[in-house]
Design a protein with these regions (language model features):
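Signature of the catalytic double-stranded beta-helix
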Residues: 1-25
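Short, conserved, surface-exposed binding loops centered on an aromatic residue
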Residues: 16-20, 29-30, 46-51
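Beta-rich nucleic-acid/ligand-interaction surfaces
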Residues: 24-38
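Amphipathic alpha-helical recognition patches that constitute DNA-binding helices
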Residues: 27, 56, 121
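Catalytic core of Fe(II)/2-oxoglutarate
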Residues: 34-35, 42-53, 62-170
Length: 170
């Protein structure tokens, strides 16, 4: 709504903030036992709108969640020394963060919830209307840390457990 968008602009101090009418990469998300999301930096460019990412928002509506099940959204320092802060995917939790090329996050530990439980949320992305090209952070898709042990970029299994999504896909 216009009121929510204005609230986001004020709270996050991001003028000229726009929602994405195409919902690129946005929407419902559901994770099951064994799922994980490697630490990554989000895509920064919306080709449809020709705008740069400014904010990410996740609203969790997991009915019941225990910390021991993992699945917490973790924000890591750029040097991959460890997490700085994390948020449980509990009902009603909202996490909003400004896009930054070094804004690495994910839920890297496999979820260990009972088979009848799952982690659910809804994600939205917001963009800057007055985007200017930044040669230090050119448009890109999501970037995943390199896995030195496997000698390849980290891979993600898609939500149905088939195939891989690599660092060049989002």
């Amino acid at each position: 709504s216009p009121e929510f968008l204005e609230w986001l602009r004020k709270v996050c101090d991001v003028p000229h903030l726009l929602p994405d009418p195409y919902l690129v990469g946005a929407g419902y998300m559901k994770s099951y036992r064994g799922d994980s999301l490697k630490i990554h930096s989000d895509f920064n460019w919306n080709e449809e709108c020709q705008t740069h990412r400014a904010l990410s928002l996740i609203l969790y509506f997991t009915p019941e969640w225990e910390e021991k099940w993992n699945g917490d959204l973790q924000f890591w320092d750029f040097d991959k020394q460890g997490k700085v802060v994390s948020y449980l995917p509990e009902m009603g939790n909202v996490v909003i963060w400004k896009y930054h090329k070094r804004g690495f996050h994910g839920h890297p530990n496999p979820i260990e919830c009972p088979d009848d439980k799952f982690r659910v949320g809804f994600r939205l992305f917001y963009y800057i209307a007055d985007s200017k090209h930044d040669w230090r952070d050119p448009p890109h898709k999501s970037l995943y840390w390199y896995d030195k042990d496997a000698d390849q970029p980290y891979h993600l299994e898609n939500e149905y457990g088939h195939g891989n999504l690599d660092a060049n896909e989002d």
